[in-house]
């Protein structure tokens, strides 16, 4: 197995992307590993050590030092070390974030919102939100306005509730005159002087008209009851006959009422002439 050359200039170190301290650490690990490989007779893992040293120095570009890119053996070595595995995960996350900036911005907004919600609200008035102060003062202002408007509304109700007082008091002479007039009307009614119709309209005629009205109403009810008891085929003829009877009685009643009105009309000029 050919022995690897441990020496390197500062230019090569800068090309590899390694600082001076990391390069010395790499050389120590290289010598130790080479001695172990000589004893065990296995292959050289110089490329894996270069990648590990690059990750330890947090230089992302130093992973390109190994020619041909990292092979399966390098990945296995890196994943076997816990701190290297973490660095690889962070690098993969950065690549994903670069490819999808929208998801990264959404994640940032979620983190910012969570921080805002986590901030406790201070009880002091100096650090409190002015919007919350205005909302807290609104109900107080409403209460004050209601209290101011209540006495005004009460005064208006009191003014409306007091009715206008009218004086219904009259003299004793007026009351006595009204009493005499009512008594004279009552005496005229009892003596027969007070009549609804003229002198030509007798009480018998008025009673006749009243009897005819009652008879007509009673006949209407009786005919309607008989009509319901009849079958449907005979109801039409019965209703026609009942209608004729009612019309004849109504004509008789109308004529008697007209006679009363004519007698009253004749009585009016007689009274005016006398």
Curated annotation (Swiss-Prot):
Region described as Disordered: 121-166
Any Pfam family the entry gives: CCDC28
Biased composition (Polar residues): 122-138
Organism (species): Homo sapiens (Human)
Upper taxonomic lineage: Eukaryota, Metazoa, Chordata, Craniata, Vertebrata
Gene that this sequence comes from: CCDC28A
Residues annotated as transmembrane: none
Site, Breakpoint for translocation to form NUP98-CCDC28A: residue positions: 76-77
Domain of life according to the entry: Eukaryota
Coiled-coil residue windows: 234-263
Protein name, entry field: Coiled-coil domain-containing protein 28A
Clinical condition linked: A chromosomal aberration involving CCDC28A has been identified in acute leukemias. Translocation t(6;11)(q24.1;p15.5) with NUP98. The chimeric transcript is an in-frame fusion of NUP98 exon 13 to CCDC28A exon 2. Ectopic expression of NUP98-CCDC28A in mouse promotes the proliferative capacity and self-renewal potential of hematopoietic progenitors and rapidly induced fatal myeloproliferative neoplasms and defects in the differentiation of the erythro-megakaryocytic lineage.
Transport keyword on record: no
UniProt entry keywords in alphabetical sequence: Chromosomal rearrangement, Coiled coil
């Amino acid at each position: 197995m050919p022995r690897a050359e441990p020496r390197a200039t500062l230019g090569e170190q800068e090309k590899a992307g390694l600082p001076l301290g990391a390069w010395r650490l790499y050389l120590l690990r290289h010598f130790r590993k080479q001695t172990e490989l000589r004893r065990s007779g296995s292959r050289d893992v110089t490329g894996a050590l270069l990648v590990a040293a690059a990750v330890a120095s947090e230089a992302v570009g130093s992973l390109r030092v190994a020619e041909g890119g990292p092979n399966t053996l390098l990945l296995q070595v890196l994943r076997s070390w816990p701190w290297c595995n973490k660095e690889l995960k962070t690098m993969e996350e950065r690549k994903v974030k670069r490819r999808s900036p929208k998801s990264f911005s959404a994640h940032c907004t979620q983190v910012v919102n969570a921080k805002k919600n986590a901030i406790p609200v201070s009880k002091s008035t100096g650090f409190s939100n002015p919007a919350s102060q205005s909302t807290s003062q609104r109900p107080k202002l409403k209460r004050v306005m209601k209290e101011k408007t209540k006495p005004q509304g009460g005064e208006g109700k009191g003014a409306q509730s007091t009715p206008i007082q009218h004086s219904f008091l009259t003299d004793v002479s007026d009351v006595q005159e009204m009493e005499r007039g009512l008594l004279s009307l009552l005496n005229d009614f009892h003596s027969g002087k007070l009549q609804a119709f003229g002198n030509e309209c007798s009480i018998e005629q008025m009673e006749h008209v009243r009897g005819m009205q009652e008879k007509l109403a009673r006949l209407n009810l009786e005919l309607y009851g008989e009509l319901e008891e009849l079958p449907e085929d005979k109801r039409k003829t019965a209703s026609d006959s009942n209608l004729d009877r009612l019309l004849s009685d109504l004509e008789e009643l109308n004529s008697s009422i007209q006679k009363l009105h004519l007698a009253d009309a004749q009585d009016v000029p007689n009274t005016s002439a006398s």
